[in-house]
């Protein structure tokens, strides 16, 4: 597997790369092989090679709603951060997988295109956002998603239309079929720039008031359970401020777990499990994680 550097001398590849550099929690072990393609063609080459040689392949986006275990990840990590182009086509925007959702929302603002205001504070990448149908403040990616270019796990290129991109709360066809997002097309609407800016300012202020942006975190840890709010259940369980190792249930928003210093992925996972157990015992409600947990234990 380490011969990938010889096989693909034109592609940026690192060995035993610490993944804590790439996650918002600042935790996680190392990747055996860390690949950073600069083009869709390079990504396609690596995916096809991994499939042909039965090498485990994991896709890494912006690392924002993710916990990578302390033992790291075996096989190949494909990091699509270098695929960042964003372009306008009439009232549509085409953004590549590695483009930040926040940057895409700002691009739309500058082009006087409305529809992505809800995304102005979501820290993920386009690829990650499509994978989990990211959303906030009443908006979701699926509301404006028109089409996507993806790779299958065999390296086959596919163009998916809106009708093929089924989505629900924190779910997508892309996740279900384990597709690798290369780009996304969003259908937006012309609007006065000052009105778009006002909406984004309003949402940014709400986010800054409610979320613990001053600490590393993995964002919203739990999905919203039917008929409840995860943060309220956690707060009512007396868990706000609870600490395990360097991980703490945020004092600002109980739905977040923050790294207050030196946290490990194991600290995060132990605290998540403790919160789930406590809420289950107190309210008979099962909290399902929204954050994705991958990798191996140390």
Curated annotation (Swiss-Prot):
Its cofactor is FAD. SUPFAM superfamilies: FAD-binding/transporter-associated domain-like (SSF56176), Uridine diphospho-N-Acetylenolpyruvylglucosamine reductase, MurB, C-terminal domain (SSF56194). Its EC number is 1.3.1.98. GO terms for cellular component: cytosol. It is an enzyme of class 1 (oxidoreductase). Pathway: Cell wall biogenesis; peptidoglycan biosynthesis. GO terms for biological process: cell division; cell wall organization; peptidoglycan biosynthetic process; regulation of cell shape. Keywords: Cell cycle, Cell division, Cell shape, Cell wall biogenesis/degradation, Cytoplasm, FAD, Flavoprotein, NADP, Oxidoreductase, Peptidoglycan synthesis. One of its GO terms (molecular function) is flavin adenine dinucleotide binding. Residues 26-191 form the FAD-binding PCMH-type domain. Cell wall formation. This is UDP-N-acetylenolpyruvoylglucosamine reductase.
